[in-house]
């Protein structure tokens, strides 16, 4: 007689084993109709799974984030169902949930076209509208293998052979004549999967290994209702307009090419923004009392073995050899910073020692994962490492948090989600050390009035971590900042200091990044601002245009004056109509467009308008320069107004 405890504390007693769906029906028909799955004693279960003992139960519906994720997973199976009806010879690989949607990798000789995708989507909707039940069967490993062998599903067989224990009991989900294998849970009926869209096709290697066969990957998105789907598609349209790759080309900021995959060729205007970001962070480093250092790009393999990176990251490291020695190009800066710390005897009086670097790092990311500035192989980290004592951790972490929030606010990011990853099952150190470390991070967050969620067991083996994820104007999440405690690396690389009692102690190391990769953060900014950078970041802040050749000398004089004032200015003396010039520089997103005619030349003035088309009237050069300087010094996100 299981007793089911609901989230509000109420209890319901049943005479026999019940499913989540049974409990929902006992509460009311509306909830039964909305029930997608259940969380039983903290674990997600299919709505039809039986609960045989006393349990705590949360009923999952499409209003829950977990419910939407489940229906997305079921939409992947629905896609598989439609594919096998249209191309029975297809071999199905994997179909997981991803952010806002799902995909399925398939092995099909026929190369899919957009017309095929449209037809697939139509078939999926036809199937979903029949409202068929999804039937779950838990079988033995051998039964599952036999079922897929009979269907010629080689990839499912490979998953069973390579990833699933023969003692396991896999779950098979039957969508009428189509069968798929999954941990689940899935929707009990396809009426929940009515609001989806297939988005694109791409190539993907089986297992992500370029030595394996190239499969076709079909991406889709799915939502709980029509309105949510429509909102998402509208947001995607806006995101496409803001795509940093497209805007980067339009504004001549950078390019990438096949001969250097994942490496950025910065053009003048893009490099100007990059350097401005560096200058801004450098001022922050000075404000928070950091040393700035520069480590070598390449170090001997022996050092990477001592640090532990060779065992964990060697596949992602670029290597080379010279004079019978093997070297690795650094994928991160931390081992180099420990080497700098180790030069000369350090005392407890020298701590905390804050060491920062704009480190040029390289990681051999899979070619299929490269994506403009967002995923590259060569990147610059605004990386820092703080060497401190145990008692200094909380104060130092608190300062890191303040630095992160100060920085993000400057760029207009105010919606920051914070997560604290705590001790994993496999870890170094005793529980007392982890208790102190985790409490120090929690208290630092509390001291700054930061709300955070805890990710149990998600910390690194060498220490807990805080992650900062910013949300942009399209509510997309970008994980950028991290504060990570490290109790392992200083010890591995022999870092010590002389304590107050003259004993040798190992410092705690705090890894700290704010922007993360400058390349990626610049990509985020391009999309956040749609290329309309605030004045302080804009590569060209002012363009001065003449109406006739008569004003050419004065225009050059004006630009010279602005440049002497430290304002990034250029002129446009082309023999074109002024309306044409204004439109062209508006498309280039230059913040201020200055027009000079006879009257402005005579009065030593400029007619000022913004890229938004706002006419600010005529101003004396000194007055305009003063206003711009004020904007730049305040790092204002807005342009001057009337």
UniProtKB/Swiss-Prot annotation:
| Signal sequence extent | none
Q: What's a Pfam family in this record?
A: TGS
**Where, in this chain's numbering, is Zn(2+) bound?**
334, 385, 511
The listed locations are: Cytoplasm
Report the record's Gene Ontology biological process terms: threonyl-tRNA aminoacylation
- How does the cofactor attach, per the note? Binds 1 zinc ion per subunit.
What GO cellular component entries does it have?
A: cytosol
Q: What InterPro entries does the record point to?
A: aa-tRNA-synt_IIb, aa-tRNA-synth_II, aa-tRNA-synth_II/BPL/LPL, Anticodon-bd, Anticodon-bd_dom_sf, Beta-grasp_dom_sf, TGS, TGS-like
Q: Which residues form the TGS domain?
A: 1-61
- Could you tell me the EC number(s) of this protein? 6.1.1.3
Q: What does it catalyze?
A: tRNA(Thr) + L-threonine + ATP = L-threonyl-tRNA(Thr) + AMP + diphosphate + H(+)
- Please tell me whether the keyword ATP-binding is annotated for this protein: yes
Give the region (Catalytic) as residue ranges.
243-534
Query: Belongs to which family?
Result: Belongs to the class-II aminoacyl-tRNA synthetase family.
Functionally, this protein is described as follows:
Catalyzes the attachment of threonine to tRNA(Thr) in a two-step reaction: L-threonine is first activated by ATP to form Thr-AMP and then transferred to the acceptor end of tRNA(Thr). Also edits incorrectly charged L-seryl-tRNA(Thr).
Subunit and interaction comment: Homodimer.
Q: What is this protein called?
A: Threonine--tRNA ligase
The organism is Shewanella baltica (strain OS195)
> Source organism lineage?
Bacteria, Pseudomonadati, Pseudomonadota, Gammaproteobacteria, Alteromonadales
